[in-house]
Each structure stands twice: as structure tokens, then as C-alpha cells.
Amino acid sequence: MINKMTSRIAVSIAVVALVSGCASSGVAQKSEDPVAAKLDTYLLEDGAVRHEVTDKNVASLWQEYDALRRAGDLTAAKGKLQQAIAITPSDAALWSGAAEIELEENSHLRAENYAAKSNFLATVGNRPLRYRNWLIIQRAREGRGDLLGAREAEIESSKLQ
């Protein structure tokens, strides 16, 4: 169920990184996981993962990351994200992508830290990214057995809906 959840988180980054006002249509999928159900409203129909950047190197690395992540090669995908972060360390969406990979690899503390860093770097107006990060934090805390912390993260994410 965690892999299914993190796959949904991965797909939702498309909405997260888009400039506000871009049109997207949600894909409704039934899920037993309430966090995954919340993410469904942020999924694009085609499942595309997009991240708009101005640096050509970062854009290329993002595309490679996305292809590798979709192919299930998380180690190589993580490497591409690390390269992109080295070029643009203040890119909140890159840190969120890194958090997602760490979550999928069950590195819960690192996933939480990366998502928190992404929230710190995200603009106030980027509610979808901040919402996504709080869902990652919630899942990471659940994975560590920190149920009180997970509940706090759930409250924070609900403020952004």
C-alpha cells in the first residue's frame, strides 16, 4: 500500500510544480488509504510528471528523473534529483521529489526532512506543493510510528485543502 501511495505522490508532483492557474483534471480512484484518497484530486489524467524550470540542465535532469522513477529505478532517479538539487538548491519541487523517493525507500526520517525543507522553500502561494509535502510528512511519521506527529501533519495538510 505504501508503494501505491508513493506512486500517487509521484504523479501528483505534476500539479505541485505547475504555475498556479494551469488547468488540470483530477482522476478519481477509490482507495482504502485516506491519504491516497486526498491525493487523487491532485492527479492528472495522463499521469504526467512535469516541473517547469528555466535552467536547461535542471530540466533535462528532471526529465531523466521522471523516466527513471516511472521505470522503478529509484536509485538512478535519486541520483538525477541530487544533481538537479546541486544546480538549483532552492527548488522546492526538487526537494519534494527527493522526499517522495526517500519515502518509497522507507527512509522515513529523511523523507520528512526533505519534505519539510521543500515546505520551507515553497512560496506561500504554492498550496498544492505544501499540501503534498504535508502528506509525505504524515506518511513518514506514520512509518516511524509517530502517530501524534502524523496527526499534526494531517491537520496541517487539511489547512491547505
Model-assigned labels for residue ranges:
Residues V16-Y42:
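Bacterial Sec signal peptide processing site at the extreme N-terminus
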Residues H51-A76:
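Alpha-helical segment of the N-proximal tetratricopeptide repeat
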